[in-house]
């Protein structure tokens, strides 16, 4: 939006976001570790929208009407456009395993609100299980071990950070996390998880038969 404003001085720019405030997704683990507040995750000035003459709309898009060049938000607002730029990026993925997707204490980590929910739940949690040892999973592990939590990571590949690192570098990172108390289960995946009566999952079964 900032670059478009530089190119189009007189254009009417509206930015619609599901996030209530601008924040760096790459720093969400710092929120989990309590090293930064929500406000300290922002990477723009307080007057960014006003200074760049950008209208900010909080909400979700439900309908994109390309014929009439209009979008409808979940809140019932209709916004017209000449050009529509969709830059939503990726999203967190919760595996369709057992009751993982409906449990009250299972979260992805993509938005600030996700980090806030994890932070709240972590207050009373001692043991935390993370499925996936990619960048986001290990960032979350860092944030939570900084809080003194006992963290276990499950990864279906034979090494951590399988997309980013070779086996030698991955082993080095793994050893550093293990020195901080993280336990890894590699080359296996979650196979079962059942919600208890209160909607919480307290154990996950791996395809090896191991229950965590």
Where are the language model's segments positioned?
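A general structural signal for well-ordered alpha-helical segments in protein cores
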Residues: 25, 29, 94, 115, ...
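Beta1-alpha1 glycine-rich phosphate/pyrophosphate-binding loop at the start
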Residues: 1-55, 143-164, 168
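A Rossmann-like FAD-binding core segment of flavoenzymes
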Residues: 10-12, 52, 56-72, 79, ...
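FAD-binding core/adjacent interface of flavoenzyme oxidoreductases
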Residues: 45-129, 187-188, 192, 203-211
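Rossmann-like NAD(P)H-binding beta-loop-alpha module
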Residues: 117-165, 201
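Surface-exposed, flexible loop/turn segments at secondary-structure boundaries
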Residues: 21, 92-93, 114, 136, ...
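Glycine/Thr-rich phosphate-binding loops of Rossmann-like dinucleotide-binding domains
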Residues: 23-24, 81, 94-95, 138-139, ...
